[in-house]
Regions:
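Short, Lys/Arg- and Gly-enriched loop/turn segments at beta-strand edges
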Residues: 60-68
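Short, basic/aromatic beta-hairpin or loop at an interaction surface
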Residues: 19-35
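Short peripheral tails and domain-boundary helices/loops at the edges of structured domains
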Residues: 67-79
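Structural detector for short beta-strands of small beta-barrel domains
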Residues: 5-22
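Short, isolated positions in well-ordered beta-strands
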Residues: 35-36, 71
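Short nucleic-acid-contacting surface segments enriched for D/E, G, S/T with interspersed K/R
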Residues: 41-56
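Short capping micro-motif at the N-terminus of alpha-helices
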Residues: 38-39, 75
Length: 79
């Protein structure tokens, strides 16, 4: 994974429907058909409808950050 603060290119996607933010086991369904599940225990609530997300992934694991949220969370791809 990349270091914070460095200018990097991330994949930009959009969550399908609404989300309430982060929590262990939360599933993020993207408009591109992919589904990712949060594997870290970070907990942050922010209800949003179809927010943009940044993805930093390698294969079926990586990190995700929802627009307007503070942190990146660890994820695994389940679909």
């Amino acid at each position: 994974f990349r270091m914070k603060g460095l200018p990097m290119e991330y994949d930009k996607e959009t969550i399908k429907g609404s989300t309430n933010g982060y929590g262990l086991g939360v599933k993020f369904e993207l408009t591109n058909g992919q589904v990712w599940e949060q594997t870290s225990s970070d907990d942050e609530y922010l209800h949003q409808f179809m927010p943009e997300v940044l993805l930093d992934t390698a294969g079926n694991i990586g990190k995700l950050k929802i627009n307007d949220m503070n942190d990146w969370v660890e994820i695994k791809r389940i679909l």
